[in-house]
A protein has these predicted regions:
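Generic alpha-helical structural context detector
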Residues: 15, 53-56, 73
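Short beta-strand segments at enzyme active-site cores
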Residues: 42-45, 120-121
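Acidic catalytic patch
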Residues: 20, 45-49, 69-97
């Protein structure tokens, strides 16, 4: 069986760069290593844009812009989804039906658009299911 793609949200990418909690960070890195090894990681343009913005401002210490740019370039191998109008319509539907903030709904809609049934997130509730997409917290669920 071919491994299924797994969508990764901004919170997971940020945590992978934050050295404040090394044991938990290692759990996140184990997931990312698995996704690289199987070539099944997926992201969206939104996730990478948010990662760039937050990694250069939110984590302590902030990452140098050049380092974040290099990471964003590396994640281009994960086929970043560019949300189109159909993705936005799907996100609006998820927002209405599940009460999700629009940014989170757009992440879920992008995961759906890429055929992902699993979404790695530290921001959404573990094991929540939005349509066909199940949220997995990488600190709770092993790869």
């Amino acid at each position: 069986l071919k491994p299924e793609p797994v969508f990764v949200d901004t919170s997971v990418l940020l945590f992978s760069e934050d050295g404040a909690r090394p044991a938990e960070r290692e759990q996140v890195l184990a997931w990312l290593r698995q996704l690289w090894a199987t070539r099944t990681g997926r992201v969206s343009v939104q996730v990478l844009n948010d990662f760039y913005l937050l990694a250069t401002r939110q984590i302590s210490p902030p990452m140098p812009q050049g380092d974040v740019r290099a990471e964003v370039r590396r994640y281009q191998h994960w086929r970043p989804w560019s949300p189109d109008q159909a993705t936005v319509e799907s996100a609006w539907s998820l927002e209405s039906r599940f009460g999700l903030p629009f940014a989170d709904a757009l992440v879920v809609a992008s995961a759906k658009a890429q055929g992902c049934t699993r979404l790695l997130s530290l921001a959404l509730p573990h094991d929540a299911v939005y349509d066909s997409v199940q949220v997995l917290n990488p600190l709770v669920s092993a790869p």
